[in-house]
């Protein structure tokens, strides 16, 4: 089989399964409204949970940062790309979340890959929740360590995996809020089992940080858990992009020496770090509290209103509200119907989610209003 035949076969298989991904160029894609092809849609696909991507204070901070530092960092943080703006953001994140150190990464995917690649050796074991993000599972699969997956949020299964002999160290990997189901991990129970077997816990709280807990400190803070490695990302609650790893001073020093994604990547622009500092200030403020309260009210309204529709609603109290449709083609058809009626909704299909669980991944944000939720509910009940 030639290269072209191999590529064509893979694409044909995706098309036949109604699983072919495509991108839509949008004029505006975050916040309450999405604009595409000169048409405006209510946006129920954005991860901008607090509606901060268009916050004037954050935009102004980025603009001022660009004027002060330029539009790029100029290199890796190990060369010339680590600015006083990066340093200040790291220190503020560490203080906010109660860690000694924070290290910035260009994306959550890079942060997860870097930590696992740097920490895990052949004699070690990773025990990962089966529904963990692709960045975590791919990194674990590519690492020389043994990968064992435990059933979703099943602490008993995790305990059995950790109890089996392992010549090296054990790392338990999970998410705070799961990206496709919107449910939360039982972090306190997971940490207890992990500690009983002398392991370390790594939590990716991409969808919890900024959105839940006191001052938006996230899933771990809410459940009174402090994992050895906490990954937070800035493309969701912060409304920007990038990520950070929170850890001890010793682990931070280790990652600075051995995390190749950190060493060999150009740092995020200092102006972006300034915008993230402004976003963090909003998240920690009374305004941040008000945005979280509004989002919680919208979630409650949606979950109450969707009852009686012909769809299976996932058990989620987060901004991620998946409606399980099952069949790929039906999910695509329903998403298209909703778009025709003015709501931008994304159909998520295998391999992103398990076979037979194609869904509409609805996301609510603090930028929405109650009438937006009511409009969505009206369309869902009418398109069942």
From Swiss-Prot:
Binding site for substrate: 21, 133, 352
Functional note: Catalyzes the decarboxylative condensation of pimeloyl-[acyl-carrier protein] and L-alanine to produce 8-amino-7-oxononanoate (AON), [acyl-carrier protein], and carbon dioxide.
EC nos: 2.3.1.47
CDD domains xref list: KBL_like
Key word Secreted present: no
Annotated keywords: Biotin biosynthesis, Pyridoxal phosphate, Transferase
Assembly and binders: Homodimer.
GO BP: any one term: biotin biosynthetic process
HAMAP family reported for this sequence: BioF_aminotrans_2
InterPro entries xref list: Aminotrans_II_pyridoxalP_BS (IPR001917), Aminotransferase_I/II_large (IPR004839), AON_synthase_class-II (IPR050087), AONS_Archaea/Proteobacteria (IPR004723), AONS_Proteobacteria (IPR022834), PyrdxlP-dep_Trfase (IPR015424), PyrdxlP-dep_Trfase_major (IPR015421), PyrdxlP-dep_Trfase_small (IPR015422)
Protein name, per record: 8-amino-7-oxononanoate synthase
Co-factor requirement: pyridoxal 5'-phosphate
Residues involved in pyridoxal 5'-phosphate binding: 108-109, 179, 207, 233
GO MF term (any one): pyridoxal phosphate binding
Taxonomic classification: Bacteria, Pseudomonadati, Pseudomonadota, Gammaproteobacteria, Enterobacterales
Residues that bear N6-(pyridoxal phosphate)lysine: 236
Top EC class for this record: transferase
Pathway info: Cofactor biosynthesis; biotin biosynthesis
Top-rank lineage group of the source organism: Bacteria
Gene name tied to this protein: bioF
Protein's organism: Escherichia coli O8 (strain IAI1)
